[in-house]
């Protein structure tokens, strides 16, 4: 039943994703983080105090998320096994973000294909932290491909990985780790101290999933009739071409698969950030590379699901 729950949750993510008005745990986690951050800032004033407070905030958010998820699941199973199974499916479904990611990427690609640069920039600003107001089509394409590649780890592979390690409650706890990083894990002066623990522990949580993405995306490239060998080579060669210890693994692999160049300088919070280039410009990046990256994401996602189901079946059987 557990493995069936995994498959049903994954299919639900593929088919319906995250309808905007449905209740979603990540929104609740986000509200908890916002309240916790206000409390920490009210109490802590020096950088040292903010770092400590940020660490306490991390423990509170992760602990509450895991505890509530475990408690709700245990209560549902206690009422009826089928209710417990349905709650498990719902938790796993909400931990995955494949369709949401694909829809967000195509929301940028469609106006770009129609020549509406302003609308494309606007939609891009919803999913990236960089300044999008002056971006040209090639830069927009690059930003979307990078976002889809990076979030293949955050939104699919890592949740499935933690689902394997500790079931739905640990997958939900991972979503809290990721949400903390997305809300406070910035190098900007406002967040550097309070978000230090969140940023570093997000790096720790994604360490193995990011490296798995190198293999999964390379195999996906073969299955999608992209250049799998170049994906494997470039992913390994450029794995450190990023300030994050994890982001370059999926980005470089996708860049190699498609024969394009990612990375480079960008503006964040009004500051110019120089980043190294990733991949080789075998050809110019194009808007079609967005849909090709989404295809790689879906195939890598299905491979990750199959891999983790296989590992769990080998360890404990079909239970």
From Swiss-Prot:
InterPro entries: Cobalamin_biosynth_CobD/CbiB. Pathway: Cofactor biosynthesis; adenosylcobalamin biosynthesis. Belongs to the CobD/CbiB family. HAMAP family: CobD_CbiB. GO terms for cellular component: plasma membrane. The chain crosses the membrane at residues 56-76, 78-98, 153-173, 204-224, 296-316. GO terms for biological process: cobalamin biosynthetic process. Keywords: Cell membrane, Cobalamin biosynthesis, Membrane, Transmembrane, Transmembrane helix. It comes from Klebsiella pneumoniae subsp. pneumoniae (strain ATCC 700721 / MGH 78578). It is found in: Cell membrane. One of its GO terms (molecular function) is ABC-type vitamin B12 transporter activity. It is a multi-pass membrane protein. Converts cobyric acid to cobinamide by the addition of aminopropanol on the F carboxylic group. This is Cobalamin biosynthesis protein CobD.
């Amino acid at each position: 039943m557990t493995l069936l729950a995994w498959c049903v949750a994954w299919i639900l993510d593929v088919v319906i994703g995250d309808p905007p008005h449905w209740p979603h745990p990540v929104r609740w986690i986000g509200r908890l983080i916002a309240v916790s951050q206000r409390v920490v800032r009210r109490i802590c004033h020096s950088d040292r105090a903010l770092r400590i407070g940020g660490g306490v905030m991390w423990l509170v958010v992760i602990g509450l998320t895991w505890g509530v998820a475990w408690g709700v699941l245990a209560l549902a199973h206690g009422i009826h096994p089928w209710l417990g199974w349905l709650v498990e499916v719902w938790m796993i479904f909400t931990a995955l973000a494949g369709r949401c990611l694909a829809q967000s990427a195509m929301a940028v690609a469609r106006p770009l294909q129609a020549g509406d640069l302003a609308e494309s920039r606007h939609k891009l600003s919803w999913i990236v932290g960089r300044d999008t107001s002056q971006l040209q089509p090639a830069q927009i394409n690059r930003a979307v491909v990078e976002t889809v590649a990076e979030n293949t780890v955050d939104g699919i592979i890592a949740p499935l990985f933690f689902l394997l390690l500790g079931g739905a409650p640990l997958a939900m706890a991972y979503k809290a780790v990721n949400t903390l990083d997305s809300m406070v894990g910035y190098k900007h002066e406002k967040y550097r101290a309070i978000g230090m623990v969140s940023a570093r522990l997000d790096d720790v949580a994604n360490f193995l999933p990011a490296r798995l993405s190198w293999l999964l995306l390379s195999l996906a490239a073969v299955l999608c009739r992209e250049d799998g060998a170049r994906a494997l080579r470039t992913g390994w060669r450029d794995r450190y071409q990023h300030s994050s210890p994890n982001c370059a693994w999926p980005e470089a692999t996708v860049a190699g698969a498609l024969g394009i160049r990612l990375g480079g300088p960008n503006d964040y919070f009004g500051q110019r950030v120089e980043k190294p280039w990733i991949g080789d410009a075998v050809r110019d990046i194009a808007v079609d590379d967005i849909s090709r990256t989404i295809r790689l994401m879906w195939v890598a996602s299905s491979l990750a699901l199959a891999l983790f189901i296989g590992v769990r079946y080998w360890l404990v059987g079909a239970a």
